[in-house]
Structures are given as structure tokens and as C-alpha cells.
Amino acid sequence: MKRVALAVTALSLLAGPAFAGEAEVFDVTKELTGAGQGRRAVNLPLVKTPEYTVNAVAVKDEIPMHRHEDGSHVLYIVSGRGTATLDNKPVALKPGIVLHIPKGVNHSIKVEGGKMTFVDFVQHSFDPNQAEKK
């Protein structure tokens, strides 16, 4: 429960300054449905500043092994189950799990039985097209 509260608090703190000018509402569930329609994953930017990015992500089957050399990621699993592999070490993923992926660590995600959604808190401004393949 503390992890959920921590993740929600972190999201609130990060999102607060980005939305200070005006309120915005995202229907994340509706936006992320593309992960079941011929796309392996959908990455929806929620907040983007020069210092950090917050994305909602839906994964249909897997995110192949890759790494980020420009900053760390913290994932909060919202729905679905699967396994993350960080430097050849498996980590079970299910709703409520918070996973820290340090800068430069090779990682992948394999979804089990459907689709997984998570919130990705990124230490830097993030472009998903710039991930380095292993």
C-alpha cells in the first residue's frame, strides 16, 4: 500500500508543475487501446518537461531487450502480469509493483496472458524512439 501511495504522490508532484497553467484530463484507457490493434506497444506521453517525462504505456506481448544511457526509469504497474528482465535477472510484474530501472541497465518486459499497462516515470525528457537496442 505504501508503494501505491508513493507512486501516486510521485505522479502528483511531477504532474503538478506541468499542469499549473490549466487542467487537462486524459482518458488513458481509451488512448492505450492501440496495443491490441496490430501494435506491439503504445506509449502515451502525459507530462513532458526538460527534466522528466511521465508516460502511460500499454504492451500487448513484449518490449524487447534494450537500455537507456541517458537516465533511469521507474515503472508503476497498473494492470496485467508479466516478467521484466533486468541484466538477466527476472522480476515478476503485477498491479501495484513499482520497478526501478537504473540508467544503462539492459531490460525487457514479457507480458503474460493479454495486455499490461504501466506508468513510466523517466528521469529525463524521453523519446521512446531513442532507446538503444542491445
Predicted regions and their residues:
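Short, conserved beta-strand element in jelly-roll/cupin
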Residues: 59, 70-84
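A short, N-terminal "cap"/entry segment at the start of jelly-roll beta-barrel domains
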Residues: 3-4, 16-56, 130-134
